[in-house]
Amino acid sequence: MNELVGLNKLEKFEDLDVESSVLHKSDSNDLEHHASLFKGIELESIQLSPGAFEGSVVFAAVDRISIHVSESVQAIEQCMKVDQDKFLFCICLCDTCKETVFGVQGAGSWVYVLPPGGEAIAPTPTHCPVLLMTVQRDALLDSENLVPDVANWFKTLKKDGEFVSSLRLANRIQDDALMTLQSAKAILAANETKTAQIIHQAMISSIAAGFSLEWLEREGFAVIHRTPALDRFLKARHLLADRDLYQGGDGDDELSKLGSKRSVEQAFSEHVKMGPRSYARIVRLHNARRKLREERFFNESIGNIAAQEGLRHRSRITANYSKHYGALQSATRRTAKRRN
């Protein structure tokens, strides 16, 4: 993936030798395959910027911790759902990024924490590396290094989590993750279960200590509150996903309830670099693409699938699809039809 750029903190992870039975790297030109590599998280990704997808993930599982360092050439939006027994920690590894990442600014200086069963919409701009790490719930909450107030904070997190504003904490977790990945390469190639448990315990203890020290110094966490623009974007995004509402002609009326037309457009521009209409077209195009790739739809025509998603002009769907993703998958579908 020659076009991917190693920026700032990402460079440390790119230096890892990943030829290991435990530590892996995958360069992918398939968005769905890229999303499937994340453990402890259910991801559905939407490609926001055009071009054949290029992404990279370095990942490892050490006992009950899973670490992923991800980057893609394209801007993407990830719909994240955390497993019921995991906490998810997210850090942007590009501390010079001026754009919003996961809906907030100040990239590189915060830790986004999602609770077990948590959900989030996470837009990331082009060439934006992120660290996603899942930790087993009980292992973290039972840590001796977690002070009671912090344990209670973790237990009472809302479903959409919190952004903890702390460059020191972000750097500490990033360094812990790097150390764990290095240990996974150096020690765990022989699948030594006991060693994995030791590394896991050290990682849990360090995470717990980092959050506890941050809390004790500040007498609480400095959190980044979601802006009205982010709230407006998320609500408008939900409305645009309602195909029946939009095809019925009520979409603009519903969007107008969220604020002025300009404020809604600014909210979309800030978070996904496009207006609501363009975003809606990309979501419908994404849904059509997903159906085109599913075997149960192979006997349906491309025109019918496009119409189901509100893309009613075959010539337009072909042109838009080719511009955004590359050539339509006609050959794949013809092969599948013959097989069936």
Model-derived regions: residue spans:
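Short histidine-centered beta-strand/loop micro-motifs
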Residues: 71, 77-84, 101-103, 122-124
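Short, conserved beta-strand element in jelly-roll/cupin
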Residues: 82-97, 133
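Conserved short histidine dyad/triad with adjacent acidic residue
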Residues: 21-24, 50-82
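Active/binding-pocket-proximal capping segment
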Residues: 259-264, 270-271, 281-287, 335-336
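Alpha-helical bundle regulatory/interaction domains
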Residues: 2-48, 96-244, 250-261, 274-275, ...
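Short, conserved glycine- and acidic-residue-centered signature motifs
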Residues: 82, 229, 281
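Short hydrophobic/aromatic patch on the recognition helix
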Residues: 264, 268, 316-317, 321
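Short, basic-rich loop-to-helix N-cap that marks the start of a DNA-contacting helix
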Residues: 278
